[in-house]
Curated annotation (Swiss-Prot):
It is an enzyme of class 1 (oxidoreductase). This is tRNA-dihydrouridine(47) synthase [NAD(P)(+)]. PANTHER family: TRNA-DIHYDROURIDINE(47) SYNTHASE [NAD(P)(+)]-LIKE. Keywords: Cytoplasm, Flavoprotein, FMN, Metal-binding, mRNA processing, NAD, NADP, Nucleus, Oxidoreductase, Repeat, tRNA processing, Zinc, Zinc-finger. It is found in: Cytoplasm; Nucleus. SUPFAM superfamilies: FMN-linked oxidoreductases. GO terms for biological process: mRNA processing; tRNA modification. It catalyses: 5,6-dihydrouridine(47) in tRNA + NAD(+) = uridine(47) in tRNA + NADH + H(+); 5,6-dihydrouridine(47) in tRNA + NADP(+) = uridine(47) in tRNA + NADPH + H(+); a 5,6-dihydrouridine in mRNA + NAD(+) = a uridine in mRNA + NADH + H(+); a 5,6-dihydrouridine in mRNA + NADP(+) = a uridine in mRNA + NADPH + H(+). Its cofactor is FMN. It comes from the Eukaryota. The active site is at C386 (proton donor). Pfam families: Dus. It comes from Saccharomyces cerevisiae (strain ATCC 204508 / S288c). One of its GO terms (cellular component) is cytoplasm.
């Protein structure tokens, strides 16, 4: 009831609504000062926001994920949902310089004349695209930052680190690309070694710990299945069938051998079960995990890349997470999946890797591969809240909420194999609206797992992101968690299993858009350790600066441009300054802008703060740059990218994830 009253007070009481009904925006519309409202042109539609951002990756979107083109009254297509079949792959160079010659040493290519890449540097330079012309980056930003440009002759800012007379690259540091890997120069960590990746691809990786825990889990499951069968049925199964020595029973040799093997296997399972039945077999000593009052950025697929996380660290974040990685591609050594755990040195400690899986064997092997291949990880997080249809139908993400026993097996398997890395889990209130299950689930997680932290998103899967998060329920679950924890510690297993000083960290998530939200939810219940921010940190990346200062910061357009400059800088250091790297930087810059443009400046608002689900009328900023940054037009986002990456190539393609480009009824 208090939450409803608070909502009414923000919008205004009934009397004020009646008085202003002819002049003020309707409910769900951000209140803009009249002088900044731009009148609609003839035949121009009002902006209508589509706020069902699923943070879903292109690699996981297909026909299962929804998205429709409905017809409106005029019979025209109504742009809704996601662009499922968008193709943002960028055009690569026609003449590709041999990777061994990037830094000019022709002797390093072992293929010689048989190499399929260009070996003539002068020929390559003559066909290379013109250099980037940028007022913000007049010279190579990577060279200026690192004293060395990893892209060498391929750099689009080549003139800033090339001796044109001798055609020799300039370097401020003595760096041997073979002796010192490029990623270490860039300050990046968690790169899997080529040898380890090849072992995964060739299925040579020794999943020793995974095999151990899976054998234990299988024995418990078999014992559970047997306990639910009638005793006669158990005795009649081939592996446990009692033979009467007085009666000859002719059996085919193959069947006899198979029955013998099944019997031996079942007896071994029985021995394993008896050995571990009264123990917390999954318990392992872990590093301490401290999320208490930490400023946490949620895992964000596509937009939560390394440059963005690095930007958030600079702007005050304490904890960041990788984009969601799928367990099976990790186990198979897929390059694109192993790119996700990469992090910048500024992110550790406080960097977590999020994994999605549907079965215990996937969870165990993915966690063991991570624990043995990368070192700068503070936690491994099991994603049990992702609402994407494709993952849900495969049994991953929020589908685990419908099968708590499977989720528990996944968590215990991960805990057993992850060495000293803590295991955490992110969940939702449930899968169906009006049927929350998180309260009962956390009780089981306390008693049956050793998770170090639980993050609860205050929405169900069915709600997605369109309705307000239920923080009353989040607070209720936090109380239930502490009560269950206190009861468990009093039990015999609890006294041995959990240290009462290291309680399970509980983090709330959903609809945090400003420092007032952050402190209201954090201070509203002492059982909540911290608050996680997702979309609020994309729309307003300086949100943690506001949390620190406990005041709203009305960033000017110049200050916001500096934030974009940092993002562009970090992007080029990560993806590179060659043609393909610049194209990637521009693409992810536009992905970032699809949220960043939704910020409504405080100085033009009649009422502040603006809620996440409130959309503004057509507005103009206090200067031209502010207006450009608030544009919903993809072409304006590309125009902003030109400030950092030079004029857009005619072959550059960017299709926004949402057909509305965040707003519907656009003709372009």
């Amino acid at each position: 009831m208090e939450q409803n009253a608070e909502k009414r007070s923000i919008v205004g009481d009934d009397n004020s609504t009646v008085k202003r009904q002819d002049t003020s925006p309707s409910k769900g519309i951000a209140h803009i000062k009249p002088e900044y409202i731009v009148p609609l042109k003839q035949n121009e539609n009002q902006k209508v926001a589509i706020y069902d951002e699923e943070m879903s990756s292109d690699r996981m979107t297909n026909e299962f994920a929804g998205g429709t083109n409905k017809k409106n009254k005029n019979g025209r297509g109504k742009k809704r949902g996601q662009n499922k079949n968008r193709d943002n792959r960028q055009v690569k160079e026609q003449n590709v310089l041999c990777p061994r010659l990037i830094h000019g040493d022709i002797s390093k290519c072992s293929f010689g004349d048989n190499c399929r890449f260009v070996h003539d540097i002068n020929l390559y330079l003559s066909t290379k695209k013109p250099e980037v012309e940028s007022n913000i980056f007049p010279s190579c930003p990577v060279f200026n930052s690192l004293g060395f440009c990893p892209m060498g002759f391929k750099c689009r800012f080549l003139s800033s680190h090339l001796n044109k007379e001798d055609n020799i690259l300039i370097s401020k540091k003595e760096i041997d690309p073979d002796a010192q890997t490029i990623w270490s120069v860039k300050g990046e960590v968690n790169h899997i070694s080529p040898e380890r990746k090849l072992d995964l691809i060739k299925r040579r990786f020794p999943f020793t710990k995974s095999n151990e825990i899976l054998e234990i889990i299988d024995s418990f499951q078999q014992e559970c299945r047997d306990s639910m069968k009638p005793e006669e049925e158990v005795e009649s199964t081939p592996q446990l069938k009692k033979q009467d020595p007085d009666v000859e029973q002719p059996v085919a040799p193959q069947v006899e051998q198979r029955n013998k093997e099944l019997s031996e296997h079942r007896m071994k399972q029985r021995e394993v079960y008896l050995k571990y039945k009264d123990t917390r077999y999954f318990a392992q000593e872990k590093k301490p995990l401290d999320l208490y009052h930490k400023k946490i950025v949620s895992p964000l697929t596509t937009v939560g890349n390394l440059p963005y996380r690095r930007l958030m660290r600079k702007l005050g974040a304490d904890v960041t997470y990788s984009e969601m990685a799928l367990a099976v591609p990790l186990i198979q050594g897929t390059n694109s999946e192993w790119a996700l755990p990469k992090a910048h040195t500024s992110e550790f400690p406080g960097f977590g890797v999020q994994v999605a899986c549907s079965k215990a064997w996937q969870a165990a092997k993915a966690a063991e591969a991570l624990a043995n291949s990368v070192s700068e990880i503070s936690e491994i997080n099991l994603n049990s809240g992702c609402p994407i249809d494709l993952l849900y139908r495969q049994g991953s993400g929020s589908a685990l909420l419908d099968n708590p026993a499977r989720m528990i097996r996944c968590l215990n398997a991960m805990n057993y194999v992850s060495k000293d890395i803590p295991i955490t889990v992110k969940i939702r209130t449930g899968t169906k609206e009006g049927h929350p299950i998180a309260e009962g689930l956390v009780k089981r997680l306390v008693n049956e797992t050793d998770v170090a932290a639980i993050t609860l998103h205050g929405r169900s899967r069915q709600q997605r992101y369109t309705k307000s998060a239920d923080w009353d329920y989040v607070s209720q679950v936090a109380d239930t968690l502490r009560s269950a924890e206190a009861d468990f510690i009093e039990t015999e297993q609890g006294k041995e299993g959990r240290d009462s000083k290291n309680r399970i960290q509980f983090v709330g998530n959903g609809d945090v858009n400003n420092f007032e939200d952050w402190y209201r939810y954090l201070n509203g219940n002492e059982n909540i350790d911290s608050v996680m921010v997702a979309r609020g940190a994309l729309i307003k990346p300086w949100i943690f600066e506001e949390v620190e200062s406990q005041q709203y910061l009305d960033k000017t357009s110049t200050e916001r441009l500096d934030i974009l400059r940092d993002y562009a800088q970090f992007s080029m250091e990560h993806w590179g300054t060659d043609e393909y790297g610049i194209s990637q930087c521009r693409r992810f810059f536009c992905e970032f802008m699809s949220f960043f443009h939704r910020y409504v400046p405080m100085g033009i608002c009649e009422r502040y703060p603006v809620k996440l689900n409130e959309r503004p009328p057509n507005w103009c900023g206090r200067d031209e740059l502010e207006t450009l940054m608030g544009s919903t037009d993809v072409n304006d986002w590309i125009k902003l990218s030109d400030l950092f990456f030079g004029k857009t190539d005619e072959n550059f393609v960017f299709v926004p994830k949402h057909k509305s480009s965040s707003y519907a009824n656009r003709d372009s």
